[in-house]
Amino acid sequence: MVRILAIETSCDETAAAVVRDRAIESNVIASQVCAHQPFGGVVPEVASRAHLENINGVITAAISEAGCDWSAIDAIAVTCAPGLVGSLLIGVTAAKTLALVHQKPLLGIHHLEGHLYASYLAEPTLEPPFLCLLVSGGHTSLIGVYGCGEYQLFGQTRDDAAGEAYDKVARLMGLGYPGGPLLDRWAQQGNPEAFDLPEGNIRLPDGKVHPYDASFSGLKTAVARLVAELRQTHPELPVADLAASFQKAVAQALTKRAIAAAVDHGFKTLAIGGGVAANSGLRQHLTAAAEPLGLRLIFPPLRLCTDNAAMIGCAAADHFQRGDRSPLDLTARSRLSLLEISALYGPTPLAVS
């Protein structure tokens, strides 16, 4: 059994958690939604300042809620890539300081690996291999999971991530921030057949459609044109129908590709991770498509879909057990492929005592 204090500050949530293997002992999140709402999106400098204000209190609360002290913590884990560098630096600096002061091992964790591990928190008995559809504001990928640090990328978006498309379309429709949850609520009241929107196919040189990759920039442009036309012809924008039609297009595109990858590569389990995993339309489409195939679906609870430190701690527990350790010169990186996470650890894994 290993107990990890984990820190997550990759974007606009200041989070800390204490995780014991795959059990959450505390999971504290300080949201910055109110700070960014006036700007209609995340402002990096505002996010960094908020992290700086919140980080000490969040860590203290996580330790307190777990009912333990520093002597019970085996290692300190922190999201170090990818993300907003200014935000990441707050968490990385805090983690390195705590590791030095309390003489604990340090583990840098890839943010996307954390989202993969949210599925283990949802289903502690889950074992690889499985396929994960990771859909968030910054990333949309189909990833084969074969073990800790062992991943294969099958597909991704070539431009806007699904969550990014949601936020941009919500802004076009005047729904405010954060756009994804607001658009989802409107979509539940609308007619998904009201408007015919493009699915976002990627054409290959031979004219065929890429089975797993997608593009959402064209869908966003189509909605922008439609909104402009409707504002000329309608006294009021049909927000619910627009939201429902857009959500259907995104959910169909993601479902089609995830199911194809699962079937083609023999996966029996499909896990969903990232903030868009909370979307009602995506959940409905995936459930309807997976059930006839006998494909097991894993949706983390809503509190584990968005950014949190518990998922980071869960990933760190496996890396710790494997003997991975990060050097104290660990730094924040705005970009790092999930396939390159070995760069976060020392050249030789340590023996686990």
Curated annotation (Swiss-Prot):
Similarity remark: Belongs to the KAE1 / TsaD family.
GO BP: tRNA threonylcarbamoyladenosine modification
Binding residues for substrate: 134-138, 167, 180, 184, 279
InterPro entries noted in UniProt: ATPase_NBD, Gcp-like_dom, KAE1/TsaD, Peptidase_M22_CS, TsaD
Species assigned in the record: Thermosynechococcus vestitus (strain NIES-2133 / IAM M-273 / BP-1)
Cofactor(s) required for function per UniProt: Fe(2+)
PROSITE patterns for the chain: GLYCOPROTEASE
Xref: SUPFAM superfamilies: Actin-like ATPase domain
Uppermost EC category: transferase
CDD domains, per the entry: ASKHA_NBD_TsaD_bac (cd24133)
UniProt keyword Iron, yes or no: yes
Details of cofactor binding: Binds 1 Fe(2+) ion per subunit.
GO CC terms in record: cytoplasm
Protein name listed in UniProt: tRNA N6-adenosine threonylcarbamoyltransferase
Top-level taxonomic group: Bacteria
